[in-house]
Structure formats: structure tokens, C-alpha cells
């Protein structure tokens, strides 16, 4: 049976059109700190690491180790990986810690090795695995920390990479909270022979991939020492991504300079503050509020659609939830 070409598309890959509300708006270069202009200490305070987690330690242990190494007060990870699982683990630092929430709607990708408990023809394996694309129902595994309620999760794609005897290597793109161990168990049941997960590696978490930004714990130790001991910051800077990377996939609203301080002081975003926005925003969507220099100001919930934000002259457009930008980056205008 011929293997179909698989389109590997996650929600994070959706391209969005930008709508302009005010063509004349400009930003003052004296204010703010765009990612490329942040001093090293600040870059770390508002940074996120695309870490290649090794098999062995828990995700929490890895984060605790990074906190201790860099002498941080806060850090958090996006999407727990079991101890035996390796791969992409975004670790957000200090002021950026809560940005990991933005990764939830982005989708994740894994490469898994499934071991079947009986011999099955290749064409049947391919046909049955294809059936698991789309909405599936899962109950978290017994060892999970989550309550074991039935819930639906989306499988965006399954691509079989190699079949050798009873071993099936495949790539799968899924919604956050999908248990690959459970998915493999159910594929085994559908094939009538049973199956278990032999190995698992996460290859993607939204915008974070197995690319040149992926760093190991050993890399981090070396780069940190180059910076602290030798004053060479180039490698450590590259190892830490700006927090804005974690919201690349989110629908965005860009605001004028005069609206920034109000949002950083706790105000919700009103329509007059908007300069441009992404098309397709729906009420209730998680949106990123950005400056015209592409600095992340805050995350919030859309209270209007894109069309309403574009057409209206007043009203609350975004209910601000988490503010990331310090209050002193832009001056108060009220």
C-alpha cells in the first residue's frame, strides 16, 4: 500500500492577514526595548529557552536546575515531558515565565516508536493509523497527574516513517494534552494485537522546533560560562529566545505608543488604542497585544471580532489577563 504524502500543519502554522486601522500611526524609537536591543541581563529576564530535554530527569527537575544555574527567581516550562521522554521543552525565564500559557493552542509534534504485540500486514497498519487522524476520545493514563475524565483531543496528522517487523516509527501532530501512550494503546486495540510505546521524542511545541535554536543543558552551561567568565555573550544570547517567539502563532493586536502604559498599569485595551490587527479574531480568542516595535505587552481575551475592532471607535476590544512589559518602558500619557 502506497504511503500518502502527509501535510504536517499545526495551528501554529496558520498564516494571518494584517488589517490596518490607522495608517499614520508611528512609534517613538526612544521608548521601549525591542528584542534585538535588549541588554543581556534584560534579554534573560524576558527570555525563553528552546531546550532539548534529555531522557532521565523530570521536566520540573530540569527547570529547577536551570533556575539554580542562572540564579533565577522564577522559571516555567511549556508542556510536561515524562522522565523517559526527550525533546523540545520550552523553558520561560523570570518575567517571561507565564508566557508558556500562549503555547497551549499552538499544537505539538512527536516522533514515536510503537511496538506491536503481533504481526500485522503493512497496508493494514497504514490504513488503521490513518483512521486516528481527527477528533479522538482519550482518558488520561493511570500514572497521569490529571483527573481521569474522558475528553476529546485532535490529531492533526499521522505520518508513518518506517515499519520494521513489529516496530512502527511514526510522526504525529496533536492538540496539547493528547497522550501519545494512550493513542498507541488504542491503535494496538484497533489492530487487534495490542501495542505499547517503546520510545518518544517531542520534535515541536508550537513555534519551538528541532532547529538551530534548540540547545542542550550542556550547551547552556558552556554558553553561560562564556558570558560570565569571559564576557562573550554571543552564544548565550542565541541560546535564549525573546518571549515574543512564544506568541508568534497567536492572533495579534498592535497598539499605539500612547496606549502601552495604560495596559501595563492594568487597563483593558480600548478600541482607540489599536493601530492594526490580525484578521479572523473571534470573541474569546487568546490574543497577544504588541507595540509597533513588535514587543509583547500583554495577553488577553478578545471581547470583539476583528471586524468589530476595525469598524468601531470605542469599547473594550481585549480583556487583559497577563501583562509582561514593565510599567516604565513607555511613558504615561494620561
Curated annotation (Swiss-Prot):
Documented EC number(s): 5.4.99.25
- The answer to whether the entry has keyword tRNA processing is yes
Task: Give this protein's Gene Ontology molecular function annotations.
Answer: RNA binding; tRNA pseudouridine(55) synthase activity
What catalytic activity does the UniProt entry give for this protein? Answer: uridine(55) in tRNA = pseudouridine(55) in tRNA
Matching Gene3D superfamilies = Pseudouridine synthase, PUA domain
Q: Name one GO biological process term.
A: mRNA pseudouridine synthesis
Q: Spell out the catalytic residues.
A: 82
| Top enzyme category | isomerase
* InterPro entries the UniProt entry points to: Dyskerin-like, PsdUridine_synth_cat_dom_sf, PsdUridine_synth_N, PUA, PUA-like_sf, PUA_sf, tRNA_PsdUridine_synth_B_fam, TruB_arch
**Superkingdom of this protein's organism:** Archaea
What keywords does the record list, in alphabetical order?
Isomerase, tRNA processing
Domain PUA per the UniProt entry, residue ranges = 250-325
* Span of the signal peptide: none
Which family does the record claim for this protein?
A: Belongs to the pseudouridine synthase TruB family. Type 2 subfamily.
Q: Which NCBIfam families match?
A: CBF5, PRK04270.1, unchar_dom_2
Q: What does this protein do?
A: Could be responsible for synthesis of pseudouridine from uracil-55 in the psi GC loop of transfer RNAs.
Q: What is this protein called?
A: Probable tRNA pseudouridine synthase B
Amino acid at each position: 500500500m502506497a504511503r500518502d504524502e502527509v501535510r504536517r500543519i499545526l495551528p501554529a502554522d496558520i498564516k494571518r492577514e494584517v488589517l490596518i486601522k490607522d495608517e499614520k500611526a508611528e512609534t517613538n524609537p526612544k521608548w521601549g526595548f525591542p528584542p534585538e536591543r535588549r541588554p543581556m541581563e534584560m534579554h534573560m529576564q524576558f527570555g525563553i529557552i528552546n531546550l532539548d530535554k534529555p531522557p532521565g530527569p523530570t521536566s520540573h527537575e530540569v527547570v529547577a536546575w536551570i533556575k539554580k544555574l542562572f540564579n533565577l527567581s522564577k522559571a516555567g516550562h511549556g508542556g510536561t515531558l515524562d522522565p523517559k521522554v526527550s525533546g523540545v521543552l520550552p523553558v520561560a525565564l523570570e518575567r517571561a515565565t507565564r508566557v508558556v500559557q500562549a503555547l497551549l493552542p499552538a499544537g505539538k509534534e512527536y516522533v514515536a516508536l510503537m511496538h506491536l504485540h503481533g504481526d500485522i500486514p503493512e497496508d493494514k497498519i497504514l490504513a488503521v493509523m490513518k483512521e486516528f487522524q481527527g477528533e479522538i476520545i482519550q482518558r488520561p493514563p493511570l500514572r497521569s497527574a490529571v483527573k481521569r475524565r474522558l475528553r476529546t483531543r485532535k490529531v492533526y496528522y499521522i505520518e508513518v516513517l518506517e515499519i520494521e517487523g513489529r516496530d512502527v516509527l511514526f510522526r504525529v501532530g496533536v492538540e496539547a494534552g493528547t497522550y501519545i501512550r494512550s493513542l498507541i494503546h488504542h491503535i494496538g486495540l484497533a489492530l487487534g494485537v495490542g501495542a505499547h510505546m517503546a520510545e518518544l521524542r517531542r520534535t515541536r511545541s508550537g513555534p519551538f522546533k528541532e532547529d538551530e535554536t534548540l540547545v542542550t543543558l550542556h550547551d547552556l552551561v558552556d554558553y553561560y560560562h562564556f558570558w560570565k567568565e569571559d564576557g562573550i555573550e554571543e552564544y548565550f544570547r542565541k541560546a535564549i529566545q525573546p518571549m515574543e517567539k512564544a506568541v508568534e502563532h497567536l492572533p495579534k493586536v498592535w497598539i499605539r505608543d500612547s496606549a502601552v502604559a495604560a495596559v501595563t498599569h492594568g487597563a483593558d485595551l480600548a478600541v482607540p488604542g489599536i493601530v492594526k490587527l490580525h484578521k479572523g479574531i473571534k470573541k474569546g480568542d487568546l490574543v497577544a497585544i504588541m507595540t509597533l516595535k513588535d514587543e509583547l505587552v500583554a495577553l488577553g481575551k478578545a471581547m470583539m471580532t476583528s471586524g468589530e475592532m476595525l469598524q468601531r471607535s470605542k469599547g473594550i476590544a481585549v480583556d487583559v489577563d497577563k501583562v509582561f512589559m514593565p510599567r516604565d518602558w513607555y511613558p504615561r500619557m494620561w
